[in-house]
């Protein structure tokens, strides 16, 4: 019923799989939302329920949780190899174009002429990617990596794996001091 209401009123859903797992909030019906035409994007929630705030981890967890949900119905690749499971590309879609659709933004979500130049890049010449045949699957199925480059609106914010717009060491120092003050009351 809820899914029909979302679709009827053009509501979008921010799926936060890591937060849902941490809080035991259940498994969102992403396959059903998408089949009904509901826009689904990914979120990291907040530090109260997701300390990592790593969008690639959310992409991976969205895919894996959707597969766990299918498994809870008794499905297994070994008993039905033709059943449709969320793919790495579909999960990456949720973290890019899906998020843009939820926000009603047509200027982000994909690399196209006239859109904001927002993208990330990962060097694939690492041991964790050795033998890969599909770079998207390698990045999504593998352990979440620290990206080598991130560009937001045409400007580098991560370069060679380091924040390019702030002094990362100073930021960590300030963050740790603030956390100690909060804990001290």
Where are these regions (language model features)?
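A general structural motif
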Residues: 1, 21-26, 102-103
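Acidic, glycine-rich loop-and-beta core segments that form the ion-binding/anion-interacting portion
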Residues: 1-14, 20-21
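Residue-level signal for inorganic ion chemistry
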Residues: 13, 45, 154
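C-terminal active-site-proximal or functional interface alpha/beta core segments in diverse enzymes
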Residues: 16-27, 52
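Extended hydrophobic-aromatic, low-complexity segments
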Residues: 24, 110-112, 129-132
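His/Asp/Glu-enriched, well-ordered alpha-helical/loop segment
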Residues: 29-126, 141-142
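C-terminal cap of metal-dependent C-N hydrolases
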Residues: 116-172
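Short, solvent-exposed cationic patches
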Residues: 172-185
């Amino acid at each position: 019923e809820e899914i029909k209401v979302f679709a009827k009123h053009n509501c979008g859903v921010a799926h936060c799989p890591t937060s849902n797992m941490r809080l035991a909030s259940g498994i969102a019906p992403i396959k059903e939302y998408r089949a009904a035409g509901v826009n689904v994007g990914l979120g990291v929630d907040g530090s109260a329920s997701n300390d990592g705030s790593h969008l690639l981890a959310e992409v991976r967890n969205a895919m894996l949780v959707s597969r766990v949900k299918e498994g809870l119905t008794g499905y297994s690749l070994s008993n039905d190899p033709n059943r449709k499971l969320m793919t790495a590309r579909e999960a990456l879609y949720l973290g890019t174009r899906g998020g843009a659709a939820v926000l009603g933004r047509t200027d982000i979500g994909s690399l196209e002429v006239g859109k904001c130049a927002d993208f990330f890049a990962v060097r694939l010449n690492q041991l964790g990617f050795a033998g890969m045949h599909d770079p998207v699957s390698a990045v999504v199925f593998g352990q979440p990596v620290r990206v080598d480059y991130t560009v937001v609106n045409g400007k580098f914010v991560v370069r060679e794996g380091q924040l390019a717009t702030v002094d990362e060491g100073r930021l960590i120092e300030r963050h740790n001091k603030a956390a100690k003050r909060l804990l001290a009351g």
